[in-house]
Regions:
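Conserved short strand/loop->alpha-helix "switch" segment adjacent to the catalytic nucleotide/phosphoryl-transfer site
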Residues: 23-47, 104-106
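Short helix-loop "hinge" at the ATP-lid/N-box region of the Bergerat-fold HATPase_c
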Residues: 53-58
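Conserved polar catalytic motif of the HATPase_c/GHKL fold
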Residues: 48, 52
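Glycine-rich/acidic phosphate-handling loop/turn and adjacent ATP-lid/helix
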Residues: 79-107
Length: 142
């Protein structure tokens, strides 16, 4: 029996759902014998992206789905995150000024900066009223 190279999960826009995503990434990493550092990096990247969507993406209190797909091919993990929140292109967010003392830095943007620094490639598009963020990360142990 072969191990799935693609796995998806539908999350609700609640912070507690991030635990389900973390578990999925860990199981996927184990199944494909990915390096622990790579699995941790992917979990941090997804944590930053998904928490940002949950915290800032919606104008109403309704439940929304956030779809996350992982696909491994030739040692490269493709990650797709899709949501129906407000249009938001994380590539348009300027990086934080890390030279300023932390108490003088404006609030926001650090999580996106972290995610962008972890991903080897990041692309955004708006499609049929949905944000679609696609990222690629080279796996050292794949």
């Amino acid at each position: 029996m072969s191990v799935a190279q693609v796995v998806s999960i539908a999350l609700l826009n609640h912070r507690r759902e991030v635990e389900r995503l973390t578990g999925l990434v860990e199981r996927f990493g184990e199944a494909h014998r990915l390096a622990a550092d790579d699995v941790s990096a992917v979990n941090l990247l997804l944590d930053e992206i998904v928490i940002n969507i949950i915290s800032h993406g919606y104008d109403d209190p309704r439940e929304h789905q956030i779809l996350v797909t992982l696909a491994l091919e030739n040692g490269v993990l493709a990650i797709r995150v899709e949501d129906d929140g407000r249009p938001f292109n994380p590539l348009d967010v300027p990086g934080p000024n890390l030279d300023l003392p932390i108490e003088e830095r404006p609030t926001g943007g650090l999580g996106i900066y972290i995610a962008r620094s972890i991903a080897d490639q990041m692309d955004y598009r708006r499609d049929a009223g949905r944000n679609v963020l696609t990222m690629k990360k080279h796996m050292s142990g794949a």
